[in-house]
Amino acid sequence: MRQLIAALVLCLLDTPVRAEDCVASVYAVGGSSQPGTKTASGIPLNDNDMTAAHKSLPFGSKVKVTNQKNGHAVTVTITDRGPYVKGRCIDLSKAGAGALGFAGLTPVSVVPVVTD
């Protein structure tokens, strides 16, 4: 039984992390989101933080987001839920979008950052 569990653990550790290719959007303080508005995780929204919203990744997880148009990449922390627009998989803070070099929509690759 121990050997079976060990084999399963090794298989899981060797499983490559898959990229999610989709469209990213930027969301910022303004409109219905005022400075300090709490995100779904309870953390206040701040345009200057390297954060993002994702539909299913756990709060606090980190992802590497790469802009497919220019190759720029950034690591952000998931603190909110969304986006709720078909075809989009991640909403980036203004700081995250700025680091990727876009201000509206752009195609990206999203990969969870695995830490030991």
For each predicted feature, which ranges?
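Secreted/periplasmic proteins
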Residues: 2-6, 14-116
